[in-house]
Design a protein with these regions (language model features):
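Short N-proximal segments of mature Sec-exported proteins
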Residues: 32-88
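Short, charged/polar, low-complexity loop and linker segments
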Residues: 28-29
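Helix-turn-helix repeat elements of alpha-solenoid scaffolds
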Residues: 19-25
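Sec-dependent N-terminal signal peptides
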Residues: 3-13
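Sec/Tat signal peptide C-region and signal peptidase I cleavage site
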Residues: 13-19
Length: 141
C-alpha cells in the first residue's frame, strides 16, 4: 500500500516534466545566439510564452502586481524578438501559433502541478527556464 501511495505521488511529477529544459536545449544548440536563427526564434518564443503564463498567474493575485508587470514586460520583449526573427526566416504564422499553443499548454500544466505539489508556480523546470531566459537569452537580445 505504501508503494502504491508513493507511486501516486510521483506520477504527477513525471507526467508534467518539460520535454526539454531551455538550458538543455541551449547546450545542444551552441550557435543559438549567433548563426542558428531557427533555434534563436524557438528559444525566445518559449521565453515569451513562459512569461505570458507567469503573468496570467499573477495578474489578479493580491500582492502579485510587481511580478505580473515584470512577467508581462518580459513576455512582450521575448515574443517580439521571436516573432521578428521567425518572420525574417520566412516562417508561417500558423506554425508559430501552433508552437505557442503547445508551449502555453505545457508551461500551464507544469505551473499548476508545481502549485499543487510545491505551493508555488516557479519551481523545478519552470524555475530553470526562467533563469535561462533571464541569464542567457535576455543578454543575447
Amino acid at each position: 500500500m505504501k508503494k502504491l501511495l508513493l507511486m501516486l505521488f510521483l506520477i504527477p511529477n513525471i507526467s508534467f516534466a518539460l520535454p526539454i529544459t531551455l538550458n538543455k536545449y541551449i547546450s545542444k544548440h551552441p550557435s543559438w545566439n549567433s548563426s542558428d536563427k531557427s533555434s534563436f526564434s524557438y528559444i525566445t518564443s518559449r521565453c515569451g510564452i513562459l512569461f505570458v503564463v507567469i503573468s496570467e498567474r499573477y495578474k489578479n493575485m493580491t500582492g502579485g502586481e510587481e511580478i505580473y508587470k515584470m512577467a508581462l514586460t518580459n513576455a512582450v520583449i521575448f515574443s517580439k524578438v521571436s516573432s521578428d526573427t521567425y518572420k525574417e526566416m520566412g516562417g508561417k504564422t500558423n506554425a508559430f501559433q501552433e508552437r505557442a499553443k503547445k508551449w502555453a499548454r505545457i508551461y500551464g500544466e507544469e505551473g499548476v502541478n508545481n502549485i499543487d505539489v510545491y505551493g508555488e508556480m516557479i519551481h523545478g523546470d519552470v524555475k530553470s527556464d526562467v533563469s535561462s531566459c533571464m541569464d542567457k537569452v535576455m543578454p543575447a537580445i
